[in-house]
Amino acid sequence: MDKGWLSVVAPPAWSRHCPWMGLLGDHGAMDVLSSRVLLHPTDPERSRVFYRDTLGLAIYREFGSGPDRGTVFFLGGGFLELSGRAAAPPAPDMALWLQVRELATTRGELGERGVPILREPKREPWGLLEMWVADPDGVRICIVEVPAEHPLRRRD
């Protein structure tokens, strides 16, 4: 069923054979209304500037006041929330995955804005085009283009 930007689908037939599906109860799927990634930056203003001005993410809402105010950004079908202040950067294995329409265009724009590219765009063995950057706290960000011929684009 289509609900605007969020598509909700029934669990696939194979799901009744997956052991973890039992964790969802008798209803088949958890009814998730919204989702967000929570980051607690070491310097909230620096991170806010990076995500807003450098990556160009749109602000959904802000809360609180002062330099440590929280900011929630639109992130495709979910949200990214910067809130609080951490004493140390997040775990080194923390990463974000952002899908864009055209990776070459995004690469050019980020280069013009001075974003250090950790890894240049490359087609992975699984068929996705990926490049890597990092936020000011070192949170790795995989920026991905799903090519037209990739199975993720199929609507069978």
Model-identified regions with their sequence ranges:
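A short acidic/small-residue loop/turn micro-motif
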Residues: 88, 125, 146-150
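N-terminal beta-strand motif that seeds the catalytic metal site of vicinal oxygen chelate
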Residues: 17-48, 94-96, 147-156
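Vicinal oxygen chelate
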Residues: 33-42, 71-74, 87-113, 129-134, ...
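Extreme N-terminal basic, low-complexity initiation segments
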Residues: 1-11
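Core segments of cupin and vicinal oxygen chelate
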Residues: 31, 38-80
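Ala/Thr-enriched low-complexity intrinsically disordered regions
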Residues: 10-13, 29
